[in-house]
Amino acid sequence: MFKRSRRVALLASLMACTAAAADAREMVAFEAGVRPGTVVVRTGERRLYLVLGNGAALRYPVAVGRPGKQWFGQRAVDGKHIRPAWSPPAEVKRDNPRLPNVIAGGSPSNPMGVAALTLSGGEYAIHGTNRPGSIGTYASYGCIRMHNHDIADLFERVSIGTPVVVTR
């Protein structure tokens, strides 16, 4: 019985480590041909890559748009915001009419988390979250959600004008 309990505890521990590793930022190999400094989001992988050059990138786990809410293409970072207030877009407000018109930055109910990188061409952003359990899923209306510690890291590494490419 004692050996079985130890094996179960060891298995549970290994599973927790594997889950944590899948949920962690990491340095990975990345194909050539993408300009260093570019952010690449692969929605099928639910991962965001910051291309560093020399065949390397930082990979972060993310949540992406639900089916029917995803978008693909190229944008650029056009704003950097710490603890941003959030005004629900019309589609979100229509689906959730009880939402207030504005949720203050820093509020636990604010879905933007600790920081946001707004993207050119629309209402989309790469931002933190108040729902960390959604990371790794198809959860949003099109924004890219990151763990708060990851958006804080990415926020420091990118600047206005950074290209962002979203692919399948």
Regions found by a protein language model. Name each.
Residues 19-24:
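Sec/Tat signal peptide C-region and signal peptidase I cleavage site
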Residues 9-17:
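Bacterial N-terminal signal peptides
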Residues 43-45, 121:
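Residue-level signal for tight coil/turn positions that link beta-strands
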Residues 26, 34, 54, 59, ...:
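Exported/periplasmic cell-wall-interacting domains
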Residues 1-10:
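Bacterial N-terminal signal peptides that target proteins for export
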Residues 40-42, 49-50, 145-146:
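Structural recognition of beta-strand segments within beta-rich domains
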Residues 31-40:
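Conserved interaction-surface patches within small, structured recognition/assembly domains
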